[in-house]
């Protein structure tokens, strides 16, 4: 056991999906995995391990934001030996050619979080995806007939920004979407020498104001789940 994860040694697979919402973790496990076993209920952050097309896969909720995902990613890698981490989450679209429910593969992530400023003594660090995972997910999505968008995302430290126009500066530089975890995931993957990728579904749009319901976000964004799982079995 680690501080925040109740699993015993060997209960978590080397490849894991990381939804922010623990109920999405439950949905993925019950919908896609064979013989899923719940290994974690600590703080309601559900975690499961099962098999997908013969490969052992885990899925673990992480909560929202850089501090929360950092807790789970640190413990999964350090205490349980996880090697491949795929975040499956939602994001707000920031470009006109990106539509609600589109798939986004995050090649890199900007952030306003100070976590890396502290870590690198005021210097910048460029958090990027693992090419192996990025290519596997892109190829999988294309084979399925999807049209994934690939590019940078913005990891925000605050959901309710006091400056509602702040996102426009990032959009001006080609940023595809805003979310709250990827910069931390990619930084920790680099620190520990493991593989990480974020696959996002656009759940709302900062330009058009279109949005989806909480129920849709929990149970209907299955394209990204299928892409993540089918990419995972190629590793």
From Swiss-Prot:
A purine D-ribonucleoside binds at residues 4, 179-181, 203-204. The active site is at residue 204. GO terms for biological process: purine nucleoside catabolic process. It is an enzyme of class 2 (transferase). The record marks 217 as: Important for catalytic activity. One of its GO terms (molecular function) is purine-nucleoside phosphorylase activity. Its EC number is 2.4.2.1. It holds the Pfam family PNP_UDP_1. Keywords: Glycosyltransferase, Transferase. It catalyses: a purine D-ribonucleoside + phosphate = a purine nucleobase + alpha-D-ribose 1-phosphate; a purine 2'-deoxy-D-ribonucleoside + phosphate = a purine nucleobase + 2-deoxy-alpha-D-ribose 1-phosphate. Phosphate binds at residues 20, 24, 43, 87-90. InterPro entries: DeoD-type (IPR004402), Nucleoside_phosphorylase_CS (IPR018016), Nucleoside_phosphorylase_d (IPR000845), Nucleoside_phosphorylase_sf (IPR035994). GO terms for cellular component: cytosol. Homohexamer; trimer of homodimers. Belongs to the PNP/UDP phosphorylase family. Catalyzes the reversible phosphorolytic breakdown of the N-glycosidic bond in the beta-(deoxy)ribonucleoside molecules, with the formation of the corresponding free purine bases and pentose-1-phosphate. This is Purine nucleoside phosphorylase DeoD-type. It comes from Clostridium perfringens (strain SM101 / Type A). The gene is deoD.
């Amino acid at each position: 056991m680690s501080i925040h994860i109740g699993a015993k040694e060997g209960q978590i697979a080397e490849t894991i999906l990381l939804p922010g919402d623990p109920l999405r973790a439950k949905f993925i496990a019950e919908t896609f995995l064979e013989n899923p076993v719940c290994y974690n209920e600590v703080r309601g952050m559900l975690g499961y391990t099962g098999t997908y097309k013969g490969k052992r896969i885990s899925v673990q909720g992480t909560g929202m934001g850089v501090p929360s995902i950092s807790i789970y990613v640190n413990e999964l890698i350090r205490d349980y030996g996880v090697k491949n981490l795929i975040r499956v989450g939602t994001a707000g679209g920031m470009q006109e050619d990106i539509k609600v429910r589109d798939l986004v593969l995050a090649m890199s992530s900007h952030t306003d979080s100070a976590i890396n400023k502290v870590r690198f003594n005021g210097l910048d660090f460029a958090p990027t995806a693992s090419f192996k995972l990025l290519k596997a997910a892109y190829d999988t999505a294309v084979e399925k007939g999807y049209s994934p968008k690939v590019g940078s995302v913005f990891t925000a430290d605050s959901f309710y920004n006091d400056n509602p126009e702040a996102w426009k500066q990032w959009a001006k530089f080609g940023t595809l979407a805003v979310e709250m975890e990827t910069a931390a995931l990619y930084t920790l993957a680099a620190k520990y020498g493991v593989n990480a990728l974020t696959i996002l579904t656009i759940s709302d749009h900062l330009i058009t104001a279109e949005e989806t319901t909480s129920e849709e976000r929990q149970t209907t964004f299955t394209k990204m789940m299928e892409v993540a799982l089918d990419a995972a079995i190629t590793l």
